[in-house]
Swiss-Prot record:
Similarity comment text for this entry: Belongs to the SIS family. GmhA subfamily.
Pathway as given in its UniProt record: Carbohydrate biosynthesis; D-glycero-D-manno-heptose 7-phosphate biosynthesis; D-glycero-alpha-D-manno-heptose 7-phosphate and D-glycero-beta-D-manno-heptose 7-phosphate from sedoheptulose 7-phosphate: step 1/1
Cited CDD domains: SIS_GmhA
GO BP: any one term: D-glycero-D-manno-heptose 7-phosphate biosynthetic process
Cofactor: Zn(2+)
Protein name: Phosphoheptose isomerase
Residues given in the record as substrate binding sites: N52, G53, G54, E65, N93, D94, S119, T120, S121, S124, Q172
Coiled coil, from the record: none
Protein residues bound to Zn(2+): H61, E65, Q172, H180
Note describing how the cofactor binds: Binds 1 zinc ion per subunit.
UniProt keyword Transmembrane helix, yes or no: no
Gene: gmhA
Length: 191
């Protein structure tokens, strides 16, 4: 019983990744996203990332791999995850959770920066508000989504969508591979 569960889970994860790879061969969205991000960084911009739950962890992981290190030693790359508990609780209490990311961008987002918006459904209200604010500020938007891309799909400059309609964990597993690939491409472009 345990062995069959383990094998079925790994096979399902492999199938979701394989399906995404076939789509990516046609769309080339990861390369487009890396190009948008590196162009911004080369012009003095920064990357601000956001998401909810596991996607928040992915947003933090992305930022720390850039400000810290991924595989090799290199200069720090400007990236911030919107995850400060004081900011989040203040804005959620005073304005509503819908605005926790957009208020941060209102304060710290600049024209030419990049917002990495992560939502497995593509419909997270606070992420959509962040995208609206990013667009108002003249920022570029790269989105990581799942399912059909949701409302986020048409709003992003580049949307990397994992077309899986099952549980979000499978989408998140592919998102972390995408994040690591983006970081590798960013490093290769900047070094």
């Amino acid at each position: 019983m345990i062995e069959s569960t383990i094998i079925s889970q790994l096979e399902e994860a492999s199938a979701v990744l394989s399906n995404f790879i076939e789509q990516e061969k046609k769309q080339n969205s990861i390369a487009k996203a890396a190009d948008v991000i590196t162009s911004s960084l080369k012009q003095g911009g920064k990357i601000i990332s956001c998401g909810n739950g596991g996607s928040s962890c992915d947003a933090m992981h992305f930022a720390e791999e850039l400000t810290g290190r991924y595989r090799e030693n290199r200069k720090a790359i400007p990236a911030i995850s919107i995850s400060d508990p004081s900011h989040m609780s203040c804005v959620a209490n005073d304005y509503g959770y819908k605005f926790v990311f957009s208020r941060y961008l209102e304060a710290l987002g600049n024209k030419g920066d990049v917002l990495l918006a992560i939502s497995t459904s593509g419909n997270s209200e606070n992420v959509l508000e962040a995208v609206k604010e990013a667009k108002n500020k003249g920022m570029f938007v790269v989105a990581l989504t799942g399912k059909d891309g949701g409302k986020l799909l048409p709003l992003a400059d580049v949307c990397i969508n994992v077309p899986h309609v099952g549980y979000a964990d499978r989408i998140q597993e592919v998102h972390i591979k995408i994040i690591h690939t983006l970081i590798l491409l960013i490093e290769q472009s900047l070094l």
